[in-house]
Structure formats: C-alpha cells, structure tokens
Design a protein with these regions (language model features):
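A well-structured
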Residues: 1-178
Length: 178
C-alpha cells in the first residue's frame, strides 16, 4: 500500500506477479481506507478497548447466564445451556420443548438492559471504525472485504421481508401439530 499507484500498476503488469494478481488487487482495494502510520497506530492501540462489548456479551452468554434444569422426555433432569438447548428443542415431547424454549429465552429477557448496552457498544465501535477509515457507513465497511454492493444486501433484506408469511404459516402449523 505504501508503493505509489503508478509504480504498483507497472509491477502488477509484470509476468512475475501475474500469479498474485487477485491477491494484490484485493489488498490494493484498501488503499483509500488505510490511514497514515500514526493514525493506524492509534487505531491499533484501541483495538482491545473496542472489543469490550463483544467480550462482555461472551462472558454473559457463556459463563454468567444460568438456565437451570429441564426434565427431558425420559424424566431425567438435564442442565439447560448452550450445548443442550438445541437437543431439547427437538425432543418428541412438546412440553420439554416448550419449557426449554421459555426457560432459555427468559434469561435473555432478564438481562435485556445488559444485552442492549453491549449491542449499543458494538454498534458504536463499528460506526467509529467506519468513520475513521472513511467509509460511507458501518454497513459499507462491513461489506467491503467481500466486495459486496449495497444493492445485494438491500435485495436480500427486501426478499426476506416479502416472504415472511410462508415461514409464519409453517411455524404456526408446526406449533399446532407438535
């Protein structure tokens, strides 16, 4: 990235770098979003601090939330947690599934303010880094590594929104039958 664009174009045109053309093109896309060495150093120094929201969520989710126990279809008490939740949701016994579902998500409801604060912190971090690097938005910055146009994202969201009804009918039918 430190090589001036004209020199880099000449280098990339050479036969010896043809094998690395795609890799170099991907790297060079970041030129407009790369800061001066001093500015990059400042961003690097706050990397650990910017991960606080994610670390807080991981600690809450992986260590602090206690989901209790659920009686499975065999009458055994099973500790409800991230590892057992999906297993209990496929139980043939409707009451086991219902209890596991509500008991699991009740913990998230009980900690909704903490979860909201961690989400807010994560969003603020994304917005800060996007602005610092000169992206139009945090969404644009998130899609940049995959070279995905915003229209692809927008079309996906529109398509999902327009097709919720069949999914809702499926879950309603499933709820009634199971």
């Amino acid at each position: 990235l430190a090589i001036d664009p004209d020199s880099m174009s000449s280098l990339m045109a050479s036969d010896c770098l043809q094998h690395y053309q795609l890799l170099l093109t991907r790297i060079l896309r970041y030129r407009d979003h790369t800061l001066s060495p001093a500015e990059e150093q400042l961003l690097a120094m706050q990397a650990e601090m910017s991960g606080t929201a994610n670390k807080t969520f991981r600690q809450l989710h992986d260590a602090d939330l206690k989901f209790g126990f659920v009686e499975n279809e065999k009458g055994e008490q099973v500790e409800l947690g991230n590892a057992t939740f999906s297993q209990l949701l496929i139980s043939p016994n409707r009451e086991v599934r219902k209890t596991a579902f509500h008991q699991y998500y009740d913990q998230f409801k009980a900690h909704e303010n903490t979860l909201a604060a961690t989400l807010c912190g994560s969003i603020q971090t994304d917005v800060y880094y996007a602005r610092a690097r000169g992206y139009e938005s945090a969404r644009t910055a998130a899609m940049f590594p995959d070279n995905m146009p915003a229209t692809v994202y927008d079309n996906l969201i529109t398509s999902v929104r327009n097709n919720f009804e069949p999914l809702h009918r499926y879950y309603d039918l499933r709820r009634r039958l199971m």
